[in-house]
């Protein structure tokens, strides 16, 4: 499976805008290729929002990246000028083992 992890530095984003963005990101959980998704704030740095997403394989991640519901969220993050760091890693875990 593929873990897609994104770190968003929201230090320059107003709280209301940030909450709305986090809700938009969380709504991506309903997309067919998303096996598991969580959005949460960093426990040590309150300015950071993290996205943890799991896909069954690299093809599912590729489809997600161009999905018409995902693209506007990415564009919004860019328009807000939010610095991001992305990490995509493959593991031999099974999606069925996730909570």
Please annotate each region the language model reported.
Residues 1-49, 56-66, 82-99:
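Short S/T/G/P-rich N-terminal loop/turn motif that feeds into the first structured element of a domain
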């Amino acid at each position: 499976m593929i873990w897609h992890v994104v770190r968003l530095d929201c230090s320059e984003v107003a709280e209301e805008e940030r909450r709305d963005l986090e809700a938009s990101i969380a709504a991506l959980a309903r997309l067919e290729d998303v096996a598991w998704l969580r959005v949460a704030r960093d426990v040590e740095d309150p300015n950071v929002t993290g996205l943890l997403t799991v896909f069954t394989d690299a093809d599912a991640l590729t489809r997600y990246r161009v999905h018409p519901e995902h693209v506007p969220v990415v564009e919004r993050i860019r328009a807000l000028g939010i610095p991001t760091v992305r990490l995509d890693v493959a593991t031999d875990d099974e999606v069925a083992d996730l909570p």
